[in-house]
Amino acid sequence: MLIDHVNKSLIYPNLNGGIMLYISNLFDILGRIAFPLFAFFVVEGYFKTKNRTKYLLNLIIFGIISEVPFDMFTSATFFNPRFNNVMFSLALGLITIWIIDVLKTKMSRILWYFISLTIVAVMCLVAMFLAVDYDYHAIIIVYLLYVLYNKPVLSVILGYLSIIKELWAFLGFGFILMYN
């Protein structure tokens, strides 16, 4: 993802054709691979961490620490509230699946699916309101990877379809299939 930010802030603004265009395209492709992997590891972390609260706090703290460099790279300002970094997207995704997981044991399966979709919709609106990176797509991908945790092929296909606008993200989803 760092490669993508370097591309967007240093290479892309200075493009004048030639070899730099190819380098920019390569960096963009490499950057698109990162997000599906981040989303996948949020779900993996949710299931495997000993302390979910600490995990969430680490995402938020790292998001706060990295916001100024992110804003400098993406908008050349110290703070841009209209565009927030991916760590906040991942934190919202974690909060979403945590709420849904807690409710899983408290209601019937059909009601749980309805409620979980409602929670996802609300969290998608929150993501758009907070202007986090990957906005509502982040919430949907984390949710799909969580709900279809034991069906990796289906989760990867639906995850990719939910973010198909990022064409090269399929490479990241391919790496997910190779995990374990």
Regions found by a protein language model. Give the residues of each.
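Alpha-helical transmembrane segments and their immediate juxtamembrane cytosolic regions
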Residues: 1-180
